[in-house]
Every structure is written in C-alpha cells, then in structure tokens.
C-alpha cells in the first residue's frame, strides 16, 4: 500500500493550537469517483470523527437543508462555510453530485460537506461553477458541487470497506475480503491466459494446473 502524508489540525475552541503531519497508507482509491480511503499510522485516537449519512436517510435530504462545507480555501487554514442544499442530483460527466450554495473555492476540494443539523458527512467538495469572461474566468463560489452520498456507498461496497458504516463489520474482515478478491481475480486472469476456465469448486493453483499440462 502506498504511503502518504497528511496534515491534522488540533483546535482549542475556535483556535488552531497545532498542525501535525501524519503518515497514512492508501487502502483503496477510485479514479472515477475521485475518492480514496486512508489508514492513519497514528497511536492517538482522533477525538472527532464524522459519520457518513445512513444509506436509508439519503432519500430524506431536501432542498433547503442546512449544510456546512469545510476546507483550506485558497490555502488558508481550514474553516467552515454555511449554506443550504440547492439541488439533490446534478449529473456532470455521468456522475452524480449534490449542489449547495455554501461558498467554496479552490482549496476546498476534498473537504467535507456536512449536514447542518445531523452532522452527517454527505460528500466531498469536488467542483465549482466558472464562467468564461474574455481571457479570464469568474467563479460562482455559491454554486458548488459535492460527491453524491450514493457514490460514497458505491465506493465503500466495491472496495469491501463496509466497516466504515456497518457496526457488524470490522477492518480485519474487510482486509481479508479484499485479499480474497485480489487472489480470485489473479487466479482467473492466469487461468484465462492458460486457456482454462475457472471452477469455483477447484482449489488448485494456476501454477499446479500449468504443471499438469
């Protein structure tokens, strides 16, 4: 797994008291959804952890629901902006987004969109609206788009990361499922290369089959 470095900010009330670099390992990523899951290499439990909106609550979202976006606007330290949901399913390049009018600008990308009353994570800020004006562009910071929560669940399920929302699942079970999937996929590819068909009941390795030929 690739290792990355992240910056974690600590607060005392509304004041940032420290900003610490922390390493982490990329568990999974998806270029289509522009999402990644990172496991932090830390021994200190993070005090505040957001919960993803429950899957059965997604259809209960309404235009006008209060929301907050948070991110490092124009490389500033993280700060929140309030607004409301203005469109529940905007399709851009065949991908679904929520639209909100909480001001967002370059630097907010990847920051969370949170429900204003429930505190749920709804998505990640992904796009802003721009208008071409001559040789420049005008940014409509009040027309921001965030990853639709259904896409979060598509990512979690495809990557076997159900433990992020299911209390009956756990990290170690998820890692075993991911390992099993990779093994089965590799086995199918190798068998296909040998002109053989995978048999679910057959536990022999492709190497053993090759030796039998």
Please state what every model-predicted region is.
Residues 25-27, 41-76:
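Active-site substrate-binding loop(s) of clan PA
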Residues 1-11, 121-213:
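C-terminal cap/linker of serine protease catalytic domains
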Residues 41-51, 77-160:
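Active-site region of chymotrypsin-like
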Residues 14-21, 74-82:
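Short coil-to-beta-strand transition motifs
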Residues 1-31:
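Catalytic-histidine neighborhood of serine endopeptidases
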Residues 20-22, 33-36, 63-65, 81, ...:
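Envelope-exposed proteins and targeting segments
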């Amino acid at each position: 797994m690739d290792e990355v470095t992240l910056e974690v900010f600590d607060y005392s009330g509304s004041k940032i008291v420290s900003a610490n670099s922390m390493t982490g390992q990329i568990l999974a990523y998806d270029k289509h959804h522009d999402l990644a899951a990172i496991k932090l290499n830390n021994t200190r439990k993070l005090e505040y952890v957001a919960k993803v909106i429950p899957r059965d609550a997604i259809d209960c979202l309404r235009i006008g629901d209060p929301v907050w976006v948070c991110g490092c606007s124009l490389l500033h330290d993280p700060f929140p902006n309030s607004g409301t949901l203005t469109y529940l399913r905007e399709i851009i390049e065949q991908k679904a987004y929520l639209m909100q009018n909480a001001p967002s600008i370059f630097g907010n990308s990847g920051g969370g969109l949170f429900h204003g009353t429930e505190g749920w994570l709804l998505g990640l800020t992904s796009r802003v609206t721009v208008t071409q004006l001559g040789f420049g562009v005008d940014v409509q910071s009040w027309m921001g788009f965030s990853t639709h929560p259904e896409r979060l669940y598509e990512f979690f399920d495809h990557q076997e990361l159900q433990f992020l929302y299911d209390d009956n699942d756990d990290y170690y079970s998820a890692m075993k499922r991911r390992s099993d999937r990779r093994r089965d996929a590799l086995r199918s590819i190798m068998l296909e290369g040998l002109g053989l068909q995978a048999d679910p009941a057959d536990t022999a390795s492709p190497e053993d089959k090759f030796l039998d030929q």
